[in-house]
């Protein structure tokens, strides 16, 4: 057999043509373990191997960017594609069109990789999550317009918080279009600030059916939302990436509605309890103020009595001093008169006697005039002190009366029964509880007026319709 001499290129072209004409090699699925994985200019280069052989492989940028997971060394995969010759190096390799992981599956692998990526970015951090509004008036709902989820949410909100205005943005909750619709719905509610809290929910399903809520784009939209997001996705055992990013996570759609709303019945009960506490506190305050007023009254009376006692003592002491002064002066003049009398007796002559007698009469008259003048002056001082005492006592009594009047006015203002003087009345049941609604009116009841109570019997009820939420 004659041998033909060919060039390397000719031989390589010949072999490449054989590969191209082999239908099986043009569409092959190869199972193996990835190694030497690397990206270069967007292209993925890898080696696929098993226990006995290795196969070079490449996936071009357009297909590599669409992979639902990141290929890594050691992963067991199935590579779908075409086996052909790489003429420049004279080797054959597989040109991959699709790569699927074995074992945990592509969706779960993508889930784990996305979760790790978002955790590193801080999407799950508790400190960045927003607080839910306590009494939301507007609630956005992002879910399917059909199915049990929306029915459960509407039923729960109607029961717990019927005053809220609801904005439903219907979306697909599974399938290829679901992530995009969910993102648009969240962005719409944020752009126009339509609500104060958003419920993102769907009913239970398989891991594949919940895949839309594991998409990174949905997580980005939740993270970027300025409005708090509450999720209720699947059943209690299901946890999606959307749940991890959300500001509050509930196990079911019903649970999400509970998390997003307060309980109106509980609020009414709390208000009723607070009102009872306020009435009790007001009664206690009134009682304390009344005791304080009585104490102030006793204190003022004691101060008034003490002032009277002190002033009386001062007057008595002044009178005693005046009397002692008068007695001293009178005694001094009396002693002087006695001395003169003794001198007169000693002189004895008639003329001297007459002169001394006249002088004695003059001195006697001067003595009485001086005593009268002294008595009059001291009497004026006594009257002046008495007037000052009376004025001081009068001013003190007036001042204390003003204080008492001020406390009396404050007590009147604090008296909860004062309103009854203007024609109002309070209805009690026979247990002493205030009846605040016609719906709670018993058949027999008591009516309290400003001057007494009356027993009454209900002959009928007339309910006046109005805004039930006015008290909120």
From Swiss-Prot:
This is Exodeoxyribonuclease 7 large subunit. GO terms for molecular function: exodeoxyribonuclease VII activity; nucleic acid binding. GO terms for biological process: DNA catabolic process. Its EC number is 3.1.11.6. Its main location: cytoplasm. It holds the Pfam family Exonuc_VII_L. Disulfide bonds: none annotated. HAMAP family: Exonuc_7_L (MF_00378). Keywords: Cytoplasm, Exonuclease, Hydrolase, Nuclease. CDD domains: ExoVII_LU_OBF. It catalyses: Exonucleolytic cleavage in either 5'- to 3'- or 3'- to 5'-direction to yield nucleoside 5'-phosphates. It is found in: Cytoplasm. Heterooligomer composed of large and small subunits. PANTHER family: EXODEOXYRIBONUCLEASE 7 LARGE SUBUNIT (PTHR30008:SF0). GO terms for cellular component: cytoplasm; exodeoxyribonuclease VII complex. It is an enzyme of class 3 (hydrolase). Belongs to the XseA family. The keyword Nuclease applies. The keyword Cytoplasm applies. NCBIfam families: xseA (TIGR00237). InterPro entries: Exonuc_VII_L, Exonuc_VII_lsu_C, OB-fold_nuc-bd_dom. Bidirectionally degrades single-stranded DNA into large acid-insoluble oligonucleotides, which are then degraded further into small acid-soluble oligonucleotides.
